[in-house]
Amino acid sequence: MGTSKLIPDTKYIDKADNLDFAAAFSRIECHYFVNGIFLEDGFILKQVDKLMNIPVHIVQGRYDVVCPATSAWELHKALPHSTLEIIPDAGHSMGEVGIAKELVNITNKYK
């Protein structure tokens, strides 16, 4: 669902008109966030040593309200070998044009 996109997508808005879908989606989202996304605070940064020997590319939407850019910056600082791309016209969704384009660019480097 496109609840975390910078630019609203009408197909997702129309999908939310279905009350059964909207209720199910809302329950899942609430369960996820009420449970602290099922990770303790700082979990990823505490486990960062496991990422030291693999390539890490961080793609962050500038207007992501789910995972703030400060989180991406902290991860990037903890992983000196990582790359960080801030997509200026994106929110949280990997389906946003700028994020999708950057993910494809990164993936193509590994062909």
Positions of predicted regions on the chain:
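Conserved alpha/beta-hydrolase "acid-adjacent" motif
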Residues: 40, 65-71
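Alpha/beta-hydrolase
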Residues: 1-47, 54
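Hydrophobic, well-ordered secondary-structure elements that form the walls
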Residues: 29, 64, 75
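Short, conserved loop/helix-junction motifs that constitute active-site signature segments
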Residues: 49-53, 78-79
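Active-site-adjacent alpha-helix of alpha/beta-hydrolase-fold enzymes
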Residues: 69-83
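Catalytic active-site module of serine/aspartate enzymes centered on a nucleophile-bearing elbow/loop
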Residues: 82-111
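Short amphipathic alpha-helical segments and helix-helix/interface helices
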Residues: 45-48, 72, 104
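Short beta-strand/loop motif that positions the catalytic acidic residue
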Residues: 51-52, 58-60, 64
